[in-house]
Amino acid sequence: MGWVSTERNHDEQPITVGVIDDDPMICQMMRLILEDYSSGRISVAFACTNAADAIEHASHNPPDVVLADIAMPGMDGIESTRQLRMLPDPPHVLILTSLSPNNTVERAIEAGAEGFVSKTDAPEDIIRRVADVCEGEPQFNPASQRQLIGDLHQHQPQSLSLIHI
């Protein structure tokens, strides 16, 4: 397996990550990618198949970052993001997705998400996005950037009314 630098000092604690996805195989895949490809610089604190369990874990032992699937039964990724960001020690949230219905990016940002990670991104890209969001850098892959621009163009008259020139 390849090693990907997360640009952190070796003396620092690993970045802790929580994963929420209703597919247990995706949870396991993300755990393997994050822990094995980062050579121990990322540690998966929990991998839950529903948002309620993940929020419970995060409230007792807050991770640095949560990867939250967007489309889940029950509480979806948007609502779980909103609830995670309301915790006393809120984690960074990256939306984990393979599809992006219209307005998903805009709604996720409004809920407090700081970026998107595609389930099909290369392992080194996923690791880099996790590390970079911890440094305060929003993380939007090309697909989410295109969708956000498209969403903004659809809402342009509304958006322009917010700008006072």
PLM regions: where:
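Active-site residues of response regulator receiver
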Residues: D21, D69, P73, T97
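The feature encodes the CheY-like receiver
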Residues: I26-C27, P73
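Short hydrophobic/Thr-rich beta-strand motif most characteristic of the beta2 strand and flanking loop
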Residues: S39-T49, H57
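Acidic catalytic/metal-coordinating carboxylates
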Residues: N50-D53, D76-E79
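Active-site beta3 strand of CheY-like receiver
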Residues: N61-L67
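Short, flexible helix-to-coil linker/hinge segments that flank and couple to helix-turn-helix
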Residues: V105-I109, T120-L160
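Conserved small/polar residues in nucleotide/adenosyl-binding loops
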Residues: I163-I165
